[in-house]
């Protein structure tokens, strides 16, 4: 589950009209959310608040084995008035990353005004308001010692360019040693057709570059053709993207290189019926280390997703296989509250099987139960699906397993006014030399079961309350 300030930061990206999907860093976002999720390892409590549309705070306390905490503050120049901040109102799908349905490439819109409205709507406003650049400031102080301070500065320089400054400073472990600090500077450029990212880190003077290219129509040229642009986006059913990244450090002589491909369906970008389930395929290569990884993610239904990954190294002949899934569920109480909306949907011929009819090529609507409503226009399927599903889920279950039988299970949901995340990790654990020697003396190596045993690795619970 995302932290509260991470959720606010995503809301800032949406309010400032920045497309975070059009980046090489987000190439495998869906597979990572379904396969590489983390589980809590101890008890953790988070208290957060969006006190004003511009200011948010978070206080964190962790216990069981090690007591630590953090204090975080966030400020943004873009008002987040329409962003739910209470833990009872935040859509759970906004906090739990899952199958990421990206949108078709488009030209970045104008910057929002100081009151949060789109720039193209404020025609009669002054130029000073139109040129207001969205800015975000975020700082976190981690306690107890060694104290660490982290910060983030985001600023939109133009509709297509964003500047990011991130720093980390740790207190020295000994009085005579110098404190450790690092600054990472990123300049991101997004035109819709392609995106680029330039990076510099003061840690070993690391330079980096990332780029992503989308095959297909160019949104910059289509934007000048009016209706032709909308017709082209409506007919775009899938998207193929290719990208690469490179790093170099003259201080430590470190070189890094990787490249990747992504193919994904775009059901949200078209009004034409789809005859396949939404899915995403990725292929990433790291030539210097000889690593190759492929992922396949599938949205089997609005509430069920599957993902798998296969990795292989041509130098060591080592392989990796991981599979995972997520299942969204609803409580019986919310089903009773939604009876009225379901009856209204039935009058229009829209029910929970609409998505399945589209896959089979059948009409989107079921037979109407009220002939008086036959002449009314049915609601659009995409609006019905996207507006209903984010608020209709109360909990989610995630499970992943690899070839070594390392299993992670995670449950995240809403309990009263709290957002709770509970997880467990199982897998082979190394035996101590003493227990292995005693087992070998009694029954030999076979009786001991080898150098490892299967058992619990971690169990934890995280609780979030926000206002």
From Swiss-Prot:
<dbReference type="GO" id="GO:0045040">
    <property type="term" value="P:protein insertion into mitochondrial outer membrane"/>
</dbReference>
<protein>
    <recommendedName>
        <fullName>Mitochondrial distribution and morphology protein 10</fullName>
    </recommendedName>
</protein>
<comment type="subunit">
    <text>Component of the ER-mitochondria encounter structure (ERMES) or MDM complex, composed of MMM1, MDM10, MDM12 and MDM34. Associates with the mitochondrial outer membrane sorting assembly machinery SAM(core) complex.</text>
</comment>
<dbReference type="GO" id="GO:0070096">
    <property type="term" value="P:mitochondrial outer membrane translocase complex assembly"/>
</dbReference>
<dbReference type="InterPro" id="IPR027539">
    <property type="entry name" value="Mdm10"/>
</dbReference>
<comment type="function">
    <text>Component of the ERMES/MDM complex, which serves as a molecular tether to connect the endoplasmic reticulum and mitochondria. Components of this complex are involved in the control of mitochondrial shape and protein biogenesis and may function in phospholipid exchange. MDM10 is involved in the late assembly steps of the general translocase of the mitochondrial outer membrane (TOM complex). Functions in the TOM40-specific route of the assembly of outer membrane beta-barrel proteins, including the association of TOM40 with the receptor TOM22 and small TOM proteins.</text>
</comment>
<keyword id="KW-0812">Transmembrane</keyword>
<dbReference type="GO" id="GO:0000002">
    <property type="term" value="P:mitochondrial genome maintenance"/>
</dbReference>
<comment type="similarity">
    <text>Belongs to the MDM10 family.</text>
</comment>
<dbReference type="GO" id="GO:0015914">
    <property type="term" value="P:phospholipid transport"/>
</dbReference>
<keyword id="KW-1134">Transmembrane beta strand</keyword>
<dbReference type="GO" id="GO:1990456">
    <property type="term" value="P:mitochondrion-endoplasmic reticulum membrane tethering"/>
</dbReference>
<dbReference type="Pfam" id="PF12519">
    <property type="entry name" value="MDM10"/>
</dbReference>
<keyword id="KW-0496">Mitochondrion</keyword>
<dbReference type="GO" id="GO:0032865">
    <property type="term" value="C:ERMES complex"/>
</dbReference>
<keyword id="KW-0472">Membrane</keyword>
<keyword id="KW-1000">Mitochondrion outer membrane</keyword>
<dbReference type="GO" id="GO:0051654">
    <property type="term" value="P:establishment of mitochondrion localization"/>
</dbReference>
<dbReference type="GO" id="GO:0001401">
    <property type="term" value="C:SAM complex"/>
</dbReference>
């Amino acid at each position: 589950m995302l932290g509260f300030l991470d959720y606010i930061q995503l809301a800032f990206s949406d309010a400032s009209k920045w497309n975070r999907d059009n980046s090489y860093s987000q190439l495998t976002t869906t597979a990572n959310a379904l396969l590489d999720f983390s589980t809590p390892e101890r008890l953790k409590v988070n208290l957060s608040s969006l006190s004003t549309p511009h200011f948010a705070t978070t206080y964190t306390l962790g216990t069981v084995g090690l007591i630590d905490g953090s204090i975080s503050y966030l400020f943004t120049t873009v008002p987040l008035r329409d962003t739910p901040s209470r833990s009872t109102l935040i859509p759970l799908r906004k906090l739990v990353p899952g199958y990421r349905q990206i949108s078709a490439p488009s030209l970045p819109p104008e910057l929002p005004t100081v009151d949060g409205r789109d720039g193209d709507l404020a025609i009669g406003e002054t130029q000073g308001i139109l040129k207001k650049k969205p800015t975000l400031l975020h700082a976190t102080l981690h306690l107890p010692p060694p104290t660490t301070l982290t910060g983030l500065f985001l600023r939109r320089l133009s509709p297509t360019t964003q500047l990011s400054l991130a720093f980390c400073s740790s207190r020295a472990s000994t009085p005579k040693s110098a404190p450790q600090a690092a600054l990472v500077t990123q300049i991101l450029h997004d035109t819709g057709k392609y995106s680029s990212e330039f990076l510099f880190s003061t840690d070993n003077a690391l330079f980096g570059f990332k780029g992503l290219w989308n095959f297909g129509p160019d949104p910059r040229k289509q934007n000048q053709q009016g209706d032709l642009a909308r017709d082209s986006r409506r007919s775009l059913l899938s998207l193929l993207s290719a990208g690469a990244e490179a790093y170099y450090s003259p201080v430590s002589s470190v070189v890094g290189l990787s490249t990747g491909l992504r193919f994904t369906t775009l059901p949200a970008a078209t009004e034409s019926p789809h005859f396949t389930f939404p899915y995403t395929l990725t292929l990433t290569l790291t030539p210097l280390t000889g690593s190759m990884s492929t992922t396949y993610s599938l949205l089997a239904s609005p509430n069920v997703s599957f993902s798998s990954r296969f990795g292989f190294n041509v130098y060591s002949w080592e392989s990796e296989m991981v599979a995972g899934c997520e299942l969204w569920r609803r409580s019986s109480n919310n089903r009773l509250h939604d009876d009225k909306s379901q009856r209204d949907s039935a009058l229009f011929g829209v029910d929970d099987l609409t998505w399945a009819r589209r896959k089979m090529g059948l009409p989107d609507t079921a037979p109407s139960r009220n002939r008086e409503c036959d002449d009314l226009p049915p609601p659009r399927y995409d609006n019905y699906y996207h507006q209903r599903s984010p608020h209709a889920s109360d909990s989610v279950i995630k499970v992943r397993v690899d070839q070594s039988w390392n299993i992670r299970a995670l449950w995240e949901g809403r309990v009263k006014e709290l957002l709770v995340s509970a997880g467990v990790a199982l897998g082979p654990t190394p035996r101590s030399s003493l227990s292995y020697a005693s087992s070998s003396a009694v029954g030999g190596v076979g009786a001991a079961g080898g150098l490892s045993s299967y058992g619990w690795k971690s169990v934890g619970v995280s609780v979030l309350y926000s206002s």
